[in-house]
From Swiss-Prot:
GO terms for molecular function: tryptophan synthase activity. Signal peptide: none annotated. Keywords: Amino-acid biosynthesis, Aromatic amino acid biosynthesis, Lyase, Tryptophan biosynthesis. NCBIfam families: trpA (TIGR00262). This is Tryptophan synthase alpha chain. Belongs to the TrpA family. PANTHER family: TRYPTOPHAN SYNTHASE ALPHA CHAIN, CHLOROPLASTIC, TRYPTOPHAN SYNTHASE, ALPHA CHAIN. It catalyses: (1S,2R)-1-C-(indol-3-yl)glycerol 3-phosphate + L-serine = D-glyceraldehyde 3-phosphate + L-tryptophan + H2O. Pfam families: Trp_syntA (PF00290). It comes from the Bacteria. GO terms for cellular component: cytosol.
Amino acid sequence: MPENRIARLLKKNKKLLIAYYMPEFPVPGATLPVLEALQKNGADLIELGIAYSDPIGDGPVIQDAAHTAIRNGMSVKKLLDLVRQARKGEGCRKITAPILLMGYCNPLIAYGGDCFLQDAASAGVDGLLLPDLPPEEADDFLERAKGFGLTVVFLVSPVTPPERIEYIDSLSTDFSYCLAVNATTGTAKLSDAGSEAAIDEYLRRVRRHTRKKFVVGFGIKDKARVGHMWELADGAVVGTALLQHIAGAGTPEETARLAGEFWQTLQ
């Protein structure tokens, strides 16, 4: 099976700027214009949230975005339909950036596990990040995902011991996703990790115990923070700050404009 877009991107050995977006937030019809704006303005990889009514690991901004998306008609099926349209260039310029879906297991189980993997791969999804999938119970899922050419990403946190970092690194298909602090998404503050020095030492520890690449997310809000994360990791994920910037938009066009303008400030 040929390499997917994520594997090809990582081979370029460049520092990555990764966007997290909740499809159909804040208004219906925003998804395709936002994807186009993010790609046009330099997003290397686009992470799409799977809207879920009980996103316990997410902060209030992403929880609110998920609830808004559901009210706007978002579902797993619609998400895959939107990815398919984006890949074909229907409703926007063709999206060629890698797409990673992030969400919880319950909606995927309700959809049908193997059916979801098959439909995600055929739609043009490149990988999955499921925070509530325990690595110790993931062997079967990993094999099935691999069969469909999908990357699977696991999480590392500041309290993950070295031997478990190595284990997670071995399981993640192409890269690991490193939480910058112990906090729900988008609520991170330096004080949560003790100090800037504590975060830096934590990321150096992750580097010592990983062989694959890793990216850092949760709480990254501006160009300075992106640059600092690039010094220590292989990529930075910006999500909550993006959602906050576009939250007041009233049309898909305004949403896309705001998304593009914000993304330019991170370069």
